[in-house]
Amino acid sequence: MTPKTPKTPKPPQTPRPMLTVGSPPCTPCSPFVLNATSFCFRKGPARSVVYQPNGHPKQVVIDGEIWPPIFKPKNVRTAKSMQFGETDVVIATYPKCGTTWLQHITSQLIKGHDYKAGKGNELCVQSPMIERMGAAFADNIKGPRVLKTHFHHYNIPKYPDTKYIYCVRNPKDCLTSYFHHNRNFKIYNWANGTWDVFLDLFASGQLAFGDYFEHLLSWLPCLKDDNVLFLKYEDMFQDLENAVYKIGQFLGGEAAHRVENPEILREIVDNSTIDAMKKDQKRWFPESQLHKVEFIRKGGSRDWKNYFTREQSDRIDSIFAAKFAGTPAEHWWKYEMAWEEKPLSIENLSMEEEEEEQSQKLFALPPLPPQRRFSRTSLLSAGYGSVWSLSSQNANMSASSSVNKDLSTFAE
Protein backbone atom coordinates (compact mmCIF):
# COMPACT_ATOMS: atom_id res chain seq x y z
CA MET A 1 0.00 0.00 0.00
CA THR A 2 1.41 3.36 -1.04
CA PRO A 3 1.90 5.61 1.95
CA LYS A 4 -0.07 8.86 1.91
CA THR A 5 1.86 11.96 1.06
CA PRO A 6 1.91 14.23 4.07
CA LYS A 7 -0.04 17.45 3.63
CA THR A 8 1.99 20.58 3.13
CA PRO A 9 1.36 22.90 6.03
CA LYS A 10 -0.41 26.13 5.13
CA PRO A 11 1.85 29.18 5.20
CA PRO A 12 1.03 31.59 8.01
CA GLN A 13 -1.20 34.47 6.98
CA THR A 14 0.29 37.91 6.81
CA PRO A 15 -0.83 39.72 9.94
CA ARG A 16 -3.36 42.51 9.59
CA PRO A 17 -1.43 45.76 9.20
CA MET A 18 -1.27 48.07 12.18
CA LEU A 19 -2.92 51.36 11.32
CA THR A 20 -2.36 54.57 13.20
CA VAL A 21 -4.86 57.27 14.05
CA GLY A 22 -5.74 59.13 10.87
CA SER A 23 -5.09 56.14 8.59
CA PRO A 24 -7.77 55.28 6.01
CA PRO A 25 -10.46 52.92 7.34
CA CYS A 26 -9.41 49.28 6.90
CA THR A 27 -12.14 47.24 5.24
CA PRO A 28 -11.74 43.64 4.02
CA CYS A 29 -11.08 45.06 0.58
CA SER A 30 -8.90 47.99 1.47
CA PRO A 31 -5.50 48.08 -0.27
CA PHE A 32 -3.87 47.24 3.07
CA VAL A 33 -5.74 43.97 3.55
CA LEU A 34 -5.86 43.17 -0.17
CA ASN A 35 -2.10 43.34 -0.51
CA ALA A 36 -1.61 41.30 2.65
CA THR A 37 -4.13 38.50 2.20
CA SER A 38 -5.49 38.60 -1.37
CA PHE A 39 -8.94 38.42 0.26
CA CYS A 40 -10.77 39.57 -2.85
CA PHE A 41 -9.56 36.72 -5.02
CA ARG A 42 -10.14 33.71 -2.75
CA LYS A 43 -13.49 32.83 -4.30
CA GLY A 44 -12.04 32.38 -7.76
CA PRO A 45 -12.51 34.34 -10.99
CA ALA A 46 -16.24 33.59 -11.40
CA ARG A 47 -17.27 34.68 -7.92
CA SER A 48 -17.87 38.06 -6.37
CA VAL A 49 -17.37 38.94 -2.71
CA VAL A 50 -20.19 40.86 -1.02
CA TYR A 51 -19.17 42.54 2.20
CA GLN A 52 -20.38 45.17 4.65
CA PRO A 53 -18.14 46.03 7.59
CA ASN A 54 -19.98 47.56 10.51
CA GLY A 55 -21.04 51.10 9.66
CA HIS A 56 -20.11 50.89 5.95
CA PRO A 57 -22.33 50.69 2.85
CA LYS A 58 -22.80 47.20 1.44
CA GLN A 59 -20.51 46.60 -1.55
CA VAL A 60 -19.13 43.85 -3.76
CA VAL A 61 -15.66 43.15 -5.12
CA ILE A 62 -15.29 41.81 -8.66
CA ASP A 63 -11.81 41.27 -10.09
CA GLY A 64 -10.35 43.51 -7.41
CA GLU A 65 -12.71 46.42 -8.11
CA ILE A 66 -15.43 47.75 -5.80
CA TRP A 67 -19.01 47.89 -7.13
CA PRO A 68 -22.57 48.17 -5.78
CA PRO A 69 -23.66 44.87 -4.17
CA ILE A 70 -26.10 43.88 -6.94
CA PHE A 71 -23.46 43.93 -9.69
CA LYS A 72 -22.57 40.60 -11.35
CA PRO A 73 -19.13 39.52 -12.62
CA LYS A 74 -20.47 38.52 -16.04
CA ASN A 75 -22.09 41.91 -16.65
CA VAL A 76 -19.06 43.91 -15.53
CA ARG A 77 -16.71 41.83 -17.67
CA THR A 78 -18.84 41.82 -20.82
CA ALA A 79 -19.29 45.59 -20.54
CA LYS A 80 -15.52 46.04 -20.66
CA SER A 81 -15.34 44.32 -24.04
CA MET A 82 -18.68 45.24 -25.61
CA GLN A 83 -18.92 46.85 -29.03
CA PHE A 84 -19.99 50.44 -29.62
CA GLY A 85 -21.19 51.79 -32.95
CA GLU A 86 -20.86 55.12 -34.72
CA THR A 87 -24.36 56.19 -33.63
CA ASP A 88 -23.75 55.39 -29.95
CA VAL A 89 -23.20 58.08 -27.33
CA VAL A 90 -21.54 57.06 -24.07
CA ILE A 91 -22.12 59.23 -20.98
CA ALA A 92 -19.16 58.67 -18.65
CA THR A 93 -18.84 60.15 -15.17
CA TYR A 94 -17.89 59.41 -11.63
CA PRO A 95 -21.14 58.94 -9.64
CA LYS A 96 -23.04 62.13 -8.83
CA CYS A 97 -21.26 64.19 -11.48
CA GLY A 98 -24.17 64.90 -13.81
CA THR A 99 -24.89 61.44 -15.20
CA THR A 100 -28.69 61.55 -15.21
CA TRP A 101 -28.67 65.19 -16.27
CA LEU A 102 -26.56 64.41 -19.35
CA GLN A 103 -28.55 61.29 -20.21
CA HIS A 104 -31.73 63.36 -20.16
CA ILE A 105 -30.27 66.17 -22.30
CA THR A 106 -28.57 63.85 -24.79
CA SER A 107 -31.66 61.68 -25.22
CA GLN A 108 -33.70 64.78 -26.13
CA LEU A 109 -31.06 65.90 -28.62
CA ILE A 110 -30.82 62.54 -30.34
CA LYS A 111 -34.41 61.28 -30.21
CA GLY A 112 -36.40 64.50 -30.17
CA HIS A 113 -40.04 64.00 -29.21
CA ASP A 114 -39.60 60.22 -29.51
CA TYR A 115 -37.84 60.36 -26.15
CA LYS A 116 -40.22 59.70 -23.28
CA ALA A 117 -39.29 58.49 -19.81
CA GLY A 118 -41.83 57.41 -17.21
CA LYS A 119 -42.84 54.73 -14.76
CA GLY A 120 -42.17 51.35 -16.34
CA ASN A 121 -39.91 52.91 -18.95
CA GLU A 122 -37.45 54.75 -16.73
CA LEU A 123 -34.37 56.49 -18.05
CA CYS A 124 -32.17 53.87 -16.37
CA VAL A 125 -33.81 51.24 -18.62
CA GLN A 126 -33.71 53.24 -21.86
CA SER A 127 -30.15 54.41 -21.19
CA PRO A 128 -28.64 51.62 -19.08
CA MET A 129 -25.42 51.53 -17.14
CA ILE A 130 -23.42 49.03 -19.16
CA GLU A 131 -21.49 47.53 -16.23
CA ARG A 132 -24.73 47.01 -14.31
CA MET A 133 -26.77 45.42 -17.11
CA GLY A 134 -24.04 43.85 -19.24
CA ALA A 135 -23.39 43.79 -22.98
CA ALA A 136 -26.27 41.46 -23.86
CA PHE A 137 -28.88 43.83 -22.42
CA ALA A 138 -27.36 46.87 -24.14
CA ASP A 139 -27.14 45.01 -27.46
CA ASN A 140 -30.93 44.65 -27.49
CA ILE A 141 -31.50 48.41 -27.31
CA LYS A 142 -32.47 49.97 -30.62
CA GLY A 143 -30.06 52.62 -31.85
CA PRO A 144 -29.09 55.32 -31.66
CA ARG A 145 -28.18 54.39 -28.09
CA VAL A 146 -27.36 56.65 -25.16
CA LEU A 147 -25.36 54.48 -22.78
CA LYS A 148 -24.13 55.25 -19.30
CA THR A 149 -20.99 54.17 -17.46
CA HIS A 150 -18.95 54.97 -14.38
CA PHE A 151 -15.93 53.10 -15.79
CA HIS A 152 -12.43 54.43 -15.41
CA HIS A 153 -11.04 55.19 -18.85
CA TYR A 154 -8.84 52.08 -18.87
CA ASN A 155 -11.95 49.89 -18.46
CA ILE A 156 -14.14 51.41 -21.15
CA PRO A 157 -14.30 50.02 -24.72
CA LYS A 158 -12.74 52.53 -27.09
CA TYR A 159 -13.99 53.09 -30.63
CA PRO A 160 -12.90 56.07 -32.76
CA ASP A 161 -16.37 56.61 -34.29
CA THR A 162 -18.24 56.52 -30.96
CA LYS A 163 -18.98 59.78 -29.13
CA TYR A 164 -18.05 59.97 -25.44
CA ILE A 165 -19.22 62.73 -23.07
CA TYR A 166 -17.32 63.00 -19.79
CA CYS A 167 -18.59 65.37 -17.09
CA VAL A 168 -16.54 66.43 -14.06
CA ARG A 169 -17.64 67.97 -10.76
CA ASN A 170 -15.73 69.37 -7.83
CA PRO A 171 -14.99 66.59 -5.32
CA LYS A 172 -16.62 68.20 -2.29
CA ASP A 173 -20.07 68.58 -3.84
CA CYS A 174 -19.66 65.17 -5.48
CA LEU A 175 -18.88 63.60 -2.11
CA THR A 176 -21.87 65.29 -0.47
CA SER A 177 -24.28 64.13 -3.16
CA TYR A 178 -22.83 60.61 -3.15
CA PHE A 179 -23.33 60.44 0.62
CA HIS A 180 -27.07 61.06 0.18
CA HIS A 181 -27.16 58.66 -2.77
CA ASN A 182 -25.78 55.82 -0.64
CA ARG A 183 -28.30 56.54 2.11
CA ASN A 184 -31.20 56.71 -0.35
CA PHE A 185 -30.61 53.58 -2.44
CA LYS A 186 -31.79 50.45 -0.64
CA ILE A 187 -29.10 48.24 -2.17
CA TYR A 188 -26.42 49.78 0.05
CA ASN A 189 -28.29 48.93 3.28
CA TRP A 190 -27.06 52.23 4.68
CA ALA A 191 -30.10 54.42 5.34
CA ASN A 192 -28.63 55.59 8.65
CA GLY A 193 -25.03 55.87 7.47
CA THR A 194 -22.82 58.54 9.01
CA TRP A 195 -21.01 61.40 7.34
CA ASP A 196 -17.59 60.90 8.93
CA VAL A 197 -17.39 57.26 7.85
CA PHE A 198 -18.41 58.11 4.30
CA LEU A 199 -15.89 60.91 3.99
CA ASP A 200 -13.13 58.54 5.13
CA LEU A 201 -14.17 55.98 2.52
CA PHE A 202 -14.35 58.61 -0.24
CA ALA A 203 -10.94 60.04 0.65
CA SER A 204 -9.32 56.59 0.59
CA GLY A 205 -11.10 55.32 -2.54
CA GLN A 206 -13.10 52.57 -0.86
CA LEU A 207 -16.55 53.19 -2.30
CA ALA A 208 -18.52 51.56 -5.09
CA PHE A 209 -17.13 52.70 -8.46
CA GLY A 210 -13.84 53.49 -6.83
CA ASP A 211 -11.61 56.46 -6.28
CA TYR A 212 -12.88 59.84 -7.52
CA PHE A 213 -9.39 61.25 -7.98
CA GLU A 214 -8.04 58.27 -9.93
CA HIS A 215 -11.19 58.26 -12.05
CA LEU A 216 -10.63 61.84 -13.18
CA LEU A 217 -6.92 61.23 -13.69
CA SER A 218 -7.68 58.30 -15.97
CA TRP A 219 -9.87 60.45 -18.24
CA LEU A 220 -7.77 63.63 -18.32
CA PRO A 221 -5.52 62.48 -21.20
CA CYS A 222 -8.66 62.43 -23.40
CA LEU A 223 -9.24 66.15 -22.93
CA LYS A 224 -8.21 66.91 -26.51
CA ASP A 225 -9.62 63.81 -28.21
CA ASP A 226 -11.94 64.63 -31.11
CA ASN A 227 -14.56 62.07 -30.08
CA VAL A 228 -14.58 62.99 -26.36
CA LEU A 229 -16.44 66.02 -25.00
CA PHE A 230 -15.32 67.21 -21.55
CA LEU A 231 -17.89 69.22 -19.60
CA LYS A 232 -17.65 70.88 -16.22
CA TYR A 233 -20.74 70.31 -14.15
CA GLU A 234 -20.55 73.81 -12.69
CA ASP A 235 -20.30 75.43 -16.13
CA MET A 236 -23.45 73.61 -17.21
CA PHE A 237 -25.45 75.17 -14.41
CA GLN A 238 -24.08 78.65 -14.93
CA ASP A 239 -25.02 78.55 -18.62
CA LEU A 240 -27.23 75.58 -19.41
CA GLU A 241 -28.21 76.84 -22.85
CA ASN A 242 -24.61 77.09 -23.96
CA ALA A 243 -23.91 73.60 -22.59
CA VAL A 244 -26.85 72.10 -24.49
CA TYR A 245 -25.72 73.90 -27.65
CA LYS A 246 -22.18 72.53 -27.27
CA ILE A 247 -23.45 69.00 -26.75
CA GLY A 248 -25.62 69.26 -29.86
CA GLN A 249 -22.76 70.57 -31.99
CA PHE A 250 -20.49 67.82 -30.68
CA LEU A 251 -23.02 65.10 -31.52
CA GLY A 252 -23.72 66.52 -34.98
CA GLY A 253 -26.48 65.36 -37.31
CA GLU A 254 -30.04 65.82 -36.05
CA ALA A 255 -28.76 66.92 -32.63
CA ALA A 256 -26.88 69.83 -34.21
CA HIS A 257 -29.94 70.81 -36.25
CA ARG A 258 -32.09 70.83 -33.12
CA VAL A 259 -29.85 73.20 -31.17
CA GLU A 260 -29.64 75.53 -34.17
CA ASN A 261 -33.40 75.96 -33.93
CA PRO A 262 -34.03 78.55 -31.15
CA GLU A 263 -37.46 77.13 -30.24
CA ILE A 264 -36.24 73.55 -29.94
CA LEU A 265 -33.15 74.65 -28.03
CA ARG A 266 -35.34 76.62 -25.61
CA GLU A 267 -37.62 73.62 -25.12
CA ILE A 268 -34.73 71.29 -24.29
CA VAL A 269 -33.22 73.80 -21.87
CA ASP A 270 -36.59 74.28 -20.12
CA ASN A 271 -37.00 70.51 -19.82
CA SER A 272 -33.55 70.19 -18.27
CA THR A 273 -33.66 72.73 -15.42
CA ILE A 274 -33.56 71.61 -11.81
CA ASP A 275 -37.23 72.41 -11.24
CA ALA A 276 -38.28 70.55 -14.39
CA MET A 277 -36.27 67.45 -13.48
CA LYS A 278 -37.64 67.41 -9.95
CA LYS A 279 -41.14 66.91 -11.35
CA ASP A 280 -42.29 63.31 -11.67
CA GLN A 281 -39.05 61.80 -10.42
CA LYS A 282 -40.31 58.31 -11.17
CA ARG A 283 -38.89 58.96 -14.65
CA TRP A 284 -35.32 58.31 -13.52
CA PHE A 285 -35.32 55.16 -11.37
CA PRO A 286 -38.01 52.73 -10.18
CA GLU A 287 -39.24 54.14 -6.87
CA SER A 288 -39.00 50.69 -5.26
CA GLN A 289 -35.20 51.07 -5.34
CA LEU A 290 -35.23 54.19 -3.17
CA HIS A 291 -36.05 55.04 0.42
CA LYS A 292 -37.16 58.47 -0.81
CA VAL A 293 -38.67 59.08 -4.24
CA GLU A 294 -36.60 62.24 -4.72
CA PHE A 295 -33.61 61.17 -6.81
CA ILE A 296 -32.86 64.73 -7.93
CA ARG A 297 -32.10 66.10 -4.48
CA LYS A 298 -30.81 69.64 -4.63
CA GLY A 299 -29.48 72.27 -7.00
CA GLY A 300 -26.75 74.80 -6.39
CA SER A 301 -23.15 74.45 -5.33
CA ARG A 302 -21.25 74.57 -2.08
CA ASP A 303 -23.82 72.41 -0.32
CA TRP A 304 -20.74 70.67 1.06
CA LYS A 305 -20.27 73.57 3.50
CA ASN A 306 -23.31 72.24 5.40
CA TYR A 307 -21.47 68.97 6.12
CA PHE A 308 -17.68 69.42 6.09
CA THR A 309 -15.62 70.50 9.05
CA ARG A 310 -12.66 72.74 8.29
CA GLU A 311 -10.32 69.81 8.89
CA GLN A 312 -12.25 67.62 6.46
CA SER A 313 -12.24 70.38 3.85
CA ASP A 314 -8.48 70.78 4.19
CA ARG A 315 -8.06 67.02 3.85
CA ILE A 316 -9.85 66.89 0.49
CA ASP A 317 -7.94 69.99 -0.64
CA SER A 318 -4.64 68.27 0.16
CA ILE A 319 -5.54 65.11 -1.73
CA PHE A 320 -6.72 67.10 -4.74
CA ALA A 321 -3.60 69.27 -4.79
CA ALA A 322 -1.31 66.23 -4.59
CA LYS A 323 -3.14 64.39 -7.38
CA PHE A 324 -3.65 67.22 -9.86
CA ALA A 325 -0.67 69.54 -9.47
CA GLY A 326 0.62 70.34 -12.95
CA THR A 327 -2.49 69.05 -14.75
CA PRO A 328 -5.22 71.05 -16.50
CA ALA A 329 -7.55 70.28 -13.57
CA GLU A 330 -5.30 71.96 -11.00
CA HIS A 331 -7.35 75.19 -10.80
CA TRP A 332 -10.71 74.05 -12.12
CA TRP A 333 -12.57 74.53 -8.82
CA LYS A 334 -10.59 77.19 -7.03
CA TYR A 335 -13.68 79.00 -5.75
CA GLU A 336 -16.09 76.06 -5.50
CA MET A 337 -13.72 74.26 -3.13
CA ALA A 338 -12.60 77.27 -1.08
CA TRP A 339 -13.61 77.26 2.58
CA GLU A 340 -14.42 80.96 2.51
CA GLU A 341 -16.95 81.78 -0.18
CA LYS A 342 -15.69 84.57 -2.40
CA PRO A 343 -18.00 87.61 -2.17
CA LEU A 344 -19.76 88.78 -5.31
CA SER A 345 -17.86 91.78 -6.71
CA ILE A 346 -16.69 93.28 -9.99
CA GLU A 347 -13.12 92.24 -9.19
CA ASN A 348 -14.10 88.63 -8.56
CA LEU A 349 -16.24 88.58 -11.69
CA SER A 350 -13.23 89.76 -13.71
CA MET A 351 -11.03 87.06 -12.19
CA GLU A 352 -13.65 84.46 -12.96
CA GLU A 353 -13.92 85.62 -16.57
CA GLU A 354 -10.13 85.24 -16.96
CA GLU A 355 -10.26 81.69 -15.62
CA GLU A 356 -13.27 80.92 -17.81
CA GLU A 357 -11.31 82.09 -20.86
CA GLN A 358 -8.49 79.70 -19.97
CA SER A 359 -11.01 76.93 -19.43
CA GLN A 360 -12.55 77.55 -22.85
CA LYS A 361 -9.16 76.88 -24.45
CA LEU A 362 -9.20 73.42 -22.90
CA PHE A 363 -12.91 72.72 -23.36
CA ALA A 364 -12.76 73.93 -26.95
CA LEU A 365 -16.05 73.86 -28.84
CA PRO A 366 -17.93 76.50 -30.84
CA PRO A 367 -19.46 78.94 -28.33
CA LEU A 368 -23.16 79.66 -28.39
CA PRO A 369 -23.94 82.66 -30.63
CA PRO A 370 -24.43 85.82 -28.52
CA GLN A 371 -28.02 86.31 -29.67
CA ARG A 372 -28.99 82.96 -28.12
CA ARG A 373 -27.28 83.37 -24.79
CA PHE A 374 -29.24 83.92 -21.60
CA SER A 375 -27.98 86.47 -19.10
CA ARG A 376 -25.84 85.05 -16.34
CA THR A 377 -27.85 85.22 -13.14
CA SER A 378 -25.75 83.16 -10.79
CA LEU A 379 -22.18 82.33 -9.95
CA LEU A 380 -23.35 79.23 -8.18
CA SER A 381 -22.93 75.76 -9.59
CA ALA A 382 -25.36 72.91 -9.28
CA GLY A 383 -25.91 69.50 -10.65
CA TYR A 384 -27.32 66.14 -10.74
CA GLY A 385 -25.87 62.73 -10.81
CA SER A 386 -26.43 59.43 -10.24
CA VAL A 387 -13.96 53.08 -10.22
CA TRP A 388 -11.66 52.97 -8.05
CA SER A 389 -9.87 49.78 -9.04
CA LEU A 390 -8.03 48.04 -6.28
CA SER A 391 -5.99 46.41 -9.01
CA SER A 392 -5.04 49.87 -10.25
CA GLN A 393 -2.76 50.30 -7.28
CA ASN A 394 0.06 48.84 -9.34
CA ALA A 395 2.68 51.12 -10.79
CA ASN A 396 1.16 51.15 -14.25
CA MET A 397 -2.19 52.63 -13.22
CA SER A 398 -1.94 54.58 -9.99
CA ALA A 399 1.34 56.43 -10.32
CA SER A 400 -0.21 59.86 -10.16
CA SER A 401 3.11 61.62 -10.48
CA SER A 402 3.85 60.07 -13.86
CA VAL A 403 0.31 60.72 -15.07
CA ASN A 404 0.62 64.34 -14.02
CA LYS A 405 3.86 64.64 -15.96
CA ASP A 406 2.19 63.30 -19.09
CA LEU A 407 -0.75 65.66 -18.65
CA SER A 408 1.32 68.78 -18.12
CA THR A 409 1.52 69.37 -21.85
CA PHE A 410 -2.25 69.96 -21.98
CA ALA A 411 -1.95 72.89 -19.59
CA GLU A 412 0.41 74.83 -21.85
UniProtKB/Swiss-Prot annotation:
It comes from Caenorhabditis elegans. InterPro entries: P-loop_NTPase (IPR027417), Sulfotransferase_dom (IPR000863). It catalyses: a phenol + 3'-phosphoadenylyl sulfate = an aryl sulfate + adenosine 3',5'-bisphosphate + H(+); bisphenol A + 3'-phosphoadenylyl sulfate = bisphenyl A sulfate + adenosine 3',5'-bisphosphate + H(+); 2-naphthol + 3'-phosphoadenylyl sulfate = 2-naphthyl sulfate + adenosine 3',5'-bisphosphate + H(+); 4-isopropylphenol + 3'-phosphoadenylyl sulfate = 4-isopropylphenyl sulfate + adenosine 3',5'-bisphosphate + H(+). GO terms for biological process: response to osmotic stress; sulfation; sulfur compound metabolic process. Optimum temperature is 25 degrees Celsius with 4-hydroxyphenylacetamide as substrate. Residues 393-402 have a biased composition (Low complexity). GO terms for cellular component: cytoplasm; cytosol; membrane. It is a peripheral membrane protein. Its EC number is 2.8.2.1. This is Sulfotransferase ssu-1. One of its GO terms (molecular function) is aryl sulfotransferase activity. It is found in: Cytoplasm, Cytosol; Membrane. Residues 1-15 have a biased composition (Pro residues). Sulfotransferase that utilizes 3'-phospho-5'-adenylyl sulfate (PAPS) as sulfonate donor to catalyze the sulfonation of xenobiotics that contain phenol functional groups. Acts in ASJ sensory neurons to modulate developmental arrest, perhaps by modifying endocrine signaling via the orphan nuclear receptor nhr-1.
